[in-house]
Amino acid sequence: MPTYPETRLTRALREGEFPVIVSLARHDLDLATAAIGAGAFAIKIHLNAYHRATGTTFGSFGEERPFLERLATLGVPLLVMVGQETVPSPQELDVLADLGFEGFNIYFTDMQPHLLQSRLRPIPALGEASTDEDLQRILDIPGAMMEASVASFADYGKPLDETDLARYRTITDKAGIPVIAPSQKKFVPDDVQRLRAAGIAAPLLGVIVTGTTPESMRAAVTPIVAAARRWR
């Protein structure tokens, strides 16, 4: 099993800095630069996936590589959702690491063994139907962090509520490792302290929050980053 370096992002996650991570609605450098300009700490992209919240299909590593190479020049931590049934090959994972990607994300139920041999830190996601046994299996992966992607699709875009926060708290109490919360619910600046209080290490802001344009990205991310900095 590989060992993973401590990075700016992993330190921020472990030390309570609440770094704001942005998941791009589409592979568009203008969106990425808008997110970074608004204060995003890290950027996440998708491969081999149909993204339900946007209706966007993300291509294979080979298809998306030109964009990934441009993205890698922006100088921020990078994460990749590697796919579902189809994921990058070991050789492609090596290239992603060489480009500067430091972690990969996938639903735990879609995990493939060769992913855990790569140089990318595993960040498996719990889903709506995940169990305590699934959580424990993630904890058994050396060096893993976790994503809590546990809202139902029917609830996407609704305000964050106490039921969501209670589930996050249950997960973070059991996990003992950094847990990232994706914005399946519509996170707003006032949610920052609530998420922190539930033990969440970082928010992952996706299209439900950011919209699909550079303008909407800046408008959404800037106040959430400001709120995160106020509560450090």
Each predicted region: which residue ranges?
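Conserved N-terminal beta1-alpha1 strand-loop-helix module at the mouth
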Residues: 1-76, 139, 219-220
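Active-site mouth loops of central-metabolism enzymes
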Residues: 12-31, 78-88, 121-130, 179-189, ...
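Catalytic cores of alpha/beta
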Residues: 29-35, 87-98, 129-141, 185-203
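Glycine-rich phosphate-binding active-site loops on the catalytic face of alpha/beta enzymes
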Residues: 42-53, 99-114, 145-156, 196-220
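Glycine/Thr-rich beta-alpha phosphate-binding loop at enzyme active sites
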Residues: 49-58, 135-169
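C-terminal helical cap(s) of enzyme catalytic domains, especially alpha/beta-barrels
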Residues: 57-58, 160-161, 209-232
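Active-site/ligand-binding-proximal alpha/beta "capping" segment
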Residues: 150-203
